[in-house]
């Protein structure tokens, strides 16, 4: 269903080209080839201890009181075989406290720690902390990556980036078979067999990041992908992307390599607020018209017209599917509509009526289509085309479409500028997360996870799971958040009073011009940012930098230049990689302006989820879970960029009167004179 971003390793929606985690196009060259990373300045590692504390055996630093509490609570939950859901503020050391607690429990119970991350890049911090822990106790870990990212043999093949994972697996197996048969094949696989012990010794001694391990292996003619599979069972900690437990097939292979049935592990889910969406995305999929047309083109190259079931042959079946998609678009969508709900079995009913098939007979026809696609794929591979047959891909998706007729999914017909498509969106991920729920001991941790009860309910966790909130230990006086009571981005208000827009723009410009600090301005959407851009470029007299939608390389270059300076303004949107995934320590960021409350625009999926939550948890719950909670998380993430160390000082101004409703959660107070309040804050001695 899904793939991985080649740049950050994140889970991606089917057939998307822009990664929602890092924002980069999957076809871009690696940015690191062009722009050197900025290293945080004036940062010191926590002070390490000379010898272990018997009460905190895997904690290598002098602990803050809150860290002791977190570790004890996690250990207690794990010892009782429970899940624990935690929101942990900046400065609590989420990575190290979770590792220390998990290793404490695992070492006493002969278990392994599985650490799930949203992106591969987040695994680097895990390896750094394992290095620190290893100075107290022997401990080792490894980061698992996909074949497409870490296999050097495949990277020698032209166009490997666009190949289907099944093709990559087939080519990999072919390379190994040829090597074992003495016919050449993959020399990296051969190198892995002869230098396995050396590689394992390096991993246990050096705790390499994913990139460091790849480089070590390739320099020695070893396959990093194969080595990871071979030695992961001997590691104390195994780090992997979410998909390794959301995908049944990948999970089975992962646990097989770990030699585990899932009962002998404890799990840490990092940035857990992303887990539910990742689970939904794992089960959601699209059937585009181009795929149907590709399958039709393939069918014309086949001898005759193969039967799918009795008198139903391939080409009429594919033509009926094409006509059905077209008819759905014409019948369900008005001139300006882009999407419309389909009935749970509307497509199946139409095809069954056309060919006089029962549901069982339609199932047989689709299985036959898949078999034809498998034969076609084998032929393509033998010819060296290295791709999956469109017939196979279409058949596999139709099988999933038939299986997604429950109320856990919403089906729709979509039309964009290019083509029509069918889409099945998972709105209830409880089946996908079942395996995770059954593990006896899982930590769900994030800096922005409130309300915890929402996460517990939607994930389907037991009511007796532990729920904890730990505030940041950093000085409260180092951060200030204010909001304005006379502006809002609410559509109805801005339409009724157009002067709101100009008032916001002038006040944003006024604050930017009078604060001699690096400033981030967060907008609720690209459309509002682009609408205000010409006025801000006219009125703000500083170096200005902009996030550009769909152009991550350009955006990251602008961000790089912004972080090098100390008096620029960077304009971005809430909820993107800059708002969540990048730290700005010290003077890299001191001031943030948040324009509006970023309620997500209503979609078919969000409306269906809202209805589902209202039915399951009570009236009003749906809007809260699908609109209010995501908006607040985005705002908290934006504000959280300000304070990354205990000496950072920062201030945020929210341009929306509706923030009064969330003032307690955001730690915000009403301001009648924002410029004076900002001036007073930054005039205080640090």
Pin down the residues of each PLM region.
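A substrate-engagement module of RecA-like helicase motors
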Residues: 40-58, 62, 109-238, 246, ...
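Walker A/P-loop NTP-binding motif
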Residues: 73-76, 95-109, 128-132
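Walker A/P-loop
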Residues: 80-98
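Signature of the SF2 helicase/ATPase Hel1-core->accessory helical subdomain module
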Residues: 98, 104, 121-124, 128, ...
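A contiguous, basic/glycine-rich beta-loop/short-helix subdomain that forms a polymer-engagement track
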Residues: 211-235, 246-257, 365-488, 495-499, ...
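Conserved RecA-like P-loop NTPase helicase motor core
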Residues: 485-499, 549-658
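Conserved interdomain hinge at the start of the Helicase C-terminal
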Residues: 489-524
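Conserved helicase motor "Helicase C" RecA-like lobe of SF1/SF2 P-loop NTPases
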Residues: 524-548
């Amino acid at each position: 269903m899904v793939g991985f971003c080649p740049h950050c390793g994140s889970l991606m929606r089917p057939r998307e080209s822009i990664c929602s985690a890092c924002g980069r196009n999957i076809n871009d060259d690696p940015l690191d080839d062009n722009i050197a990373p900025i290293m945080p300045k004036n940062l010191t590692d926590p002070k390490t201890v000379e010898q272990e504390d018997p009460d905190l055996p895997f904690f290598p630093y002098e602990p803050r009181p809150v860290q002791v509490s977190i570790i004890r609570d996690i250990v207690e939950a794990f010892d009782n075989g429970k899940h624990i859901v935690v929101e942990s503020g900046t400065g609590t050391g989420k990575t190290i406290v979770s590792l220390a607690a998990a290793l404490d429990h695992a070492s006493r119970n002969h278990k392994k720690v599985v650490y799930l991350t949203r992106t591969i890049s987040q695994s680097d911090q895990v390896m750094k902390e394992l290095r620190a822990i290893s100075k107290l106790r022997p401990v080792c870990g490894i980061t698992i990556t996909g074949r497409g990212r870490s296999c050097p043999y495949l990277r020698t093949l032209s166009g490997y980036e666009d190949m289907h994972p099944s093709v990559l697996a087939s080519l990999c197996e072919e390379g190994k078979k040829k090597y074992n048969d003495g016919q050449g094949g993959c020399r990296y696989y051969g190198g892995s067999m002869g230098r396995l012990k050396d590689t394992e010794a390096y991993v246990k001694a050096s705790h390499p990041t994913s990139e460091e391990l790849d480089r070590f292996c390739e320099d020695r003619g070893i396959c990093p992908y194969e080595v990871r599979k071979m030695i992961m069972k001997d590691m104390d900690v195994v780090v992997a992307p979410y998909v390794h437990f959301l995908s049944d097939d990948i999970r089975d292979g992962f646990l097989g390599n770990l030699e585990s049935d899932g009962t002998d592990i404890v799990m840490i889910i990092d940035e857990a607020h992303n887990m539910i969406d990742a689970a939904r995305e794992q089960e959601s999929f699209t059937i585009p018209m181009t795929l149907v047309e590709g399958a039709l083109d393939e069918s014309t190259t086949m001898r005759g017209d193969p039967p799918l079931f009795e008198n139903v042959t391939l080409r009429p079946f594919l033509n009926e599917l094409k006509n059905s998609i077209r008819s759905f678009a014409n019948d369900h969508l008005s001139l300006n509509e882009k999407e419309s709900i389909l009935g749970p079995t509307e497509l199946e009913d139409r095809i069954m009526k056309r060919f006089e098939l029962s549901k069982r007979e339609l199932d047989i026809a689709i299985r036959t289509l898949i078999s034809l696609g498998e034969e076609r794929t084998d032929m393509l591979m033998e010819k060296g085309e290295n791709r999956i047959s469109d017939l196979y891909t279409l058949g596999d998706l139709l099988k999933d479409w038939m299986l997604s007729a429950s109320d856990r999914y919403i089906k729709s017909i979509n039309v964009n500028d290019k083509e029509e498509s069918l889409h099945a969106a998972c709105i209830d991920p409880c089946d996908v997360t079942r395996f995770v729920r059954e593990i006896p001991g899982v930590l769900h941790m994030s800096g922005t996870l409130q309300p915890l009860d929402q996460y517990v309910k939607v994930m389907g966790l037991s009511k007796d799971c532990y729920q904890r909130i730990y505030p940041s230990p950093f000085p409260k006086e180092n951060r200030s958040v204010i909001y304005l009571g006379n502006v809002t981005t609410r559509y109805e208000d801005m339409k009724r009073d157009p002067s709101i827009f100009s008032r916001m723009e002038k006040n944003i410009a006024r604050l930017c011009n009078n604060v001699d600090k690096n400033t981030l301005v967060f907008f609720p959407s690209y459309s509002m940012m682009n609408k205000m851009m010409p006025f801000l470029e006219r009125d703000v007299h500083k170096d200005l930098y902009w996030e550009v939608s769909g152009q991550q390389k350009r955006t990251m270059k602008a961000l790089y230049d912004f972080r090098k300076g100390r008096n620029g303004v960077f304009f971005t949107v809430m909820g993107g990689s800059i708002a969540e995934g990048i730290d700005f320590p010290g003077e890299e960021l001191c001031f943030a302006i948040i324009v509006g409350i970023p309620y997500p625009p209503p979609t078919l999926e969000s409306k269906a989820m809202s209805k589902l939550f209202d039915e399951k948890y009570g009236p009003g719950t749906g809007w809260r879970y699908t609109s209010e909670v995501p908006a607040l998380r985005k705002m908290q993430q934006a504000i959280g960029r300000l304070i990354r160390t205990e000496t950072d000082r920062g201030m945020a101004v929210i341009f929306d009167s509706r923030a009064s409703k969330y003032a307690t959660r955001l730690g915000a107070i009403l301001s009648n004179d924002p410029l004076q309040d900002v001036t007073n804050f930054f005039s205080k001695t640090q």
